[in-house]
Amino acid sequence: MELNGRSLSPDILASVSEDGTALTFSPNGKTMLERSRAVIDKAVAERIPVYGVTTGLGSRATEALSAEELSGFSVETLNGRDHALAPALPRQVVRAAMAVRLNTFLTGAAGVSPAVADHLRLVFNAGLTPVVGGWGTIGAADLLLGATMGRAVMGLGGQLVDRNERTSAAADALAMADLTPPQLGPRDGLALANHACFSAGMAGLAVAEARRALESHIAIAALSFQAFGGNVTPMDSAVLALKSHSHDARVAGRMRALLDGSDLLDPANARRLQDPISIRNAVQVLGAAERSLAEAAEVVTIEMNASSDNPAVLVDADRVVSTGNYHTPHLALTCDYAARGLAAAATLSVARIAKLCSERLTGLPQYLADPEVGTNGFAPLLKLAESLLGGLQHLAQPTALWPSINADGVEDGLTLAFQSARNFREAAKLGRRITALEALAAAQACDLRGRDLPHRLSELQAAIRAVSPRIRESRPLAEDIEKVVEVI
């Protein structure tokens, strides 16, 4: 997979961070690495004041570094900021951060030594992953997490995990992989540590997970609509044109396509004049969720292909300047927004499960119990659905903000973007489980109703039934639910 600093997407990130894909640098990316490093070398040679290169960091930004300090400042930068606290982040999250950092190096703004950038790439390709604690970033760059990653990658300390999940001292793991870290020069320590790539990487994984969650929501909402015997008029394109939300129209189009061939597409075959909101307004809620996710994807894609460096090299201007690009309010706010969209979709999903379980509303056996056996059917699963929804709603609460107390008042703002992105990703995972529960309920309702399904919903029903047979007698369903998560 070739990185170029411009075209990394959430779906590509999710793939390369998990499946062992080797990364390469594009020719133009290599050129940008060399050109940006030349600007840094010139600033050092001429002792031009550059934050974190020829001066100290944070509250020491006005202090010039001596010649003696310059030689070891990159190592000192990593050693002094490697404080990320356990529990450790999942391997995929750290590898996502590594991939984003490699990609953003190629913008030319970091000024990192090409040898250091290539060493990080080789460590990634060797399947080695730093052990990085999940606590330590406030979203004004992911400094402590980045330092922990950088120190391990350079063999200065910490631990690396290999493809077989064996954990070793970083220096030992590099030696076993026949990798020799290059010497760090000026700016290199800060380039490895001071960036927002953990936040962007986590958010990229969250968007990829949320896309799967939302597509599942849409498909299973259509199956529930069929099982319920819903009134199709709220999905009519002429009705939706009265309020021109494009995402609503797209969701409705996908649901109508899934229902193609159903007798319910003729409103005369609906069982009710007006359905419960969870059925009637699925399009509006899922459309709003899709819009929030689209905005998140746009912001995250920008962040994964942009510099979050401070300072940053302006290659064409031959300058190094201070920036605010390490600060990530766009990322934090859009992750909060998208998580709320998932919460809204999941809330209606749980409501539809309850409606499908109601004999009064569906005409089907209470709690979808098989009438020949005499069990409580899906009644216990309603508790599970609400438990999952409670967890998701908690994750979807906006992340709190306050004035930061860092750097003696110089660094007095934060975003907590990483926490927002982490919550967003976990919310998407819970959303997929809630949808799996709805899938089981909808499949059971379709079986009990006994009507032929349209072609695409018949395929979906068959996929569900391939991993979770029709529920007749009581049986544990936890394993079924996890299997359904994957097939839908």
Which sequence ranges carry the predicted segments?
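C-terminal auxiliary extensions adjacent to catalytic cores
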Residues: 1-21, 25-32, 36-44, 70, ...
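Residues that scaffold, gate, or flank divalent-cation-dependent active/transport sites
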Residues: 7-42, 46-53, 57-95, 101, ...
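Short loop/turn hinge sites at secondary-structure boundaries
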Residues: 19-20, 47, 80-83, 108, ...
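FAD-binding core of FAD-dependent oxidoreductases
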Residues: 51-73, 80-103, 131-154, 166, ...
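Generic short alpha-helical segment signal, independent of protein family or function
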Residues: 62, 78-85, 98, 102-105, ...
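Short gly/ser-rich anion-binding loops that grip negatively charged ligand groups
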Residues: 63, 83-87, 106-110, 286, ...
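FAD-binding glycine-rich core of flavoenzymes that anchor FAD
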Residues: 109-137
